[in-house]
Amino acid sequence: MEKPTSSTNGEKRKSPCDSNNRNDEMQETPNRDLALEPSLKKMKTSEYSTVLVLCYRKTKKIHSNQLENDQSQENSVNPVQEEEDEGSSQEDEDLDSSAESSKQDEDLQLPEGSFQEDKDLGLSEGSSQEDEDLDSSERSSQEEKDPDASEGSSEEGEED
């Protein structure tokens, strides 16, 4: 099966058999198919996985962000709420102290000048307003406790 070729100048070369050519072609074809298939699979897989991963990550990010946001909101809101609670408790304490001072004022029956003294001590005008508000709320609570007494006092007011 050796044939001299003109290009080899009389040198004998082995030419491949037809069966070998077929085997090579068959091997090349599946390799080509396999080579194309993985690249297609990779592209398809990467496209689909990218879409799935993006969706998954979005969902995951949303959940993780929500959890982180919830935790951060709890952490950030709680200190704010605690500060507000502290602020409101301070206001409550201020109201309690002003209520006590107004009770003391009532007990001592100080003249109206006591409000001026409060202003001189550095208390704001609002604190005297709060004292007046507390006095009216104390009166209303006393009226609720003693409806007969409030009726009597209202009758006295009508007589004047």
From Swiss-Prot:
* Residue spans of biased composition, Basic and acidic residues class: 10-35, 136-148
Q: Where do Acidic residues bias regions lie? A: 81-97
Question: Per the record, where are the segments of Polar residues compositional bias?
Answer: 64-79
* Highest rank taxon of the organism: Eukaryota
InterPro entries named in the record: SPAN-X_fam
Pfam families given for it?
Answer: SPAN-X
Q: Where is this region: Disordered?
A: 1-48, 64-160
The UniProt similarity line reads: Belongs to the SPAN-X family.
What's the name of the protein? Sperm protein associated with the nucleus on the X chromosome N2
Species of provenance:
Pongo pygmaeus
